[in-house]
Swiss-Prot record:
Keywords: Glutamine amidotransferase, Hydrolase, Lyase, Pyridoxal phosphate. It comes from the Bacteria. It comes from Thermosipho africanus (strain TCF52B). This is Pyridoxal 5'-phosphate synthase subunit PdxT. GO terms for biological process: glutamine catabolic process; pyridoxal phosphate biosynthetic process; pyridoxine metabolic process. The keyword Hydrolase applies. It catalyses: aldehydo-D-ribose 5-phosphate + D-glyceraldehyde 3-phosphate + L-glutamine = pyridoxal 5'-phosphate + L-glutamate + phosphate + 3 H2O + H(+); L-glutamine + H2O = L-glutamate + NH4(+). The gene is pdxT. The lineage of its organism: Bacteria, Thermotogati, Thermotogota, Thermotogae, Thermotogales. Belongs to the glutaminase PdxT/SNO family. L-glutamine binds at G46, E47, S48, R105, I133, R134.
Amino acid sequence: MKIGVSGIQGDFREHKVMLEKLGVDVKVVRKPEELDEVDGLVIPGGESTTMIRIMKMVNLYEKLKQKIKEGFPVFGTCAGMILLSKEVVNFPQDSLGVIDIKVERNAYGRQVDSFEEQIEVKGFEKTFNAIFIRAPKVVDYGENVEVLATYMDSPVLLRQNNVLVASFHPELTEDTRIHEYFLNMVKK
C-alpha cells in the first residue's frame, strides 16, 4: 500500500512522518498523474483557498474530484476538511464537494485561540487528544454522513463512504489511531 500526501501547501510533512511511523510507503503528491501511483490521499491543514488555487493551476483539482467520486479514499484535516466539504458557509470559495457537510472556516478562533481537547472517538477505547488550530466547524451534515467524534456537540471527525475529515490535527500528536483508521479504509 502506498499513501499520497498532498504536498501543495500546508503541514504535509507531519502527515508523512505519521504514516511512515506506521510503516507505510508515502508519496508527496503535487501533480495529477501522481494520484495514479497511490492507493489513498491525505489532504493536510494549511490555507484552503491557496490549496484550491494551486490544485487548479496544476490540474490536480478535477482529477482528484473524479477519483474520489469513483471511490478513491481521502482523508482531510482542517483545511483539508474545508476542501472536501460540500459548502463553505462564511467565505465564498470553491470546494471539491465530495462529503455532504457545510463548514464555517476558522470557527474556533484565530491562531492565538488554538487549543487541545480530549475527545471520544467512536470505536476507540481511550480518548484522543485533538489539537484545534483555526479549525473549521461543521454547521450541517447530510444523513449519509457518519459522525465519529464531537466537541461541544459539534461534529469534528466525520466519514461518508471513502471520505474521512477532521476539524483538528491528528498529525501533530504522537497518537496514530486516526491515521490507522484511514489506512483501514484504504485496505477495504
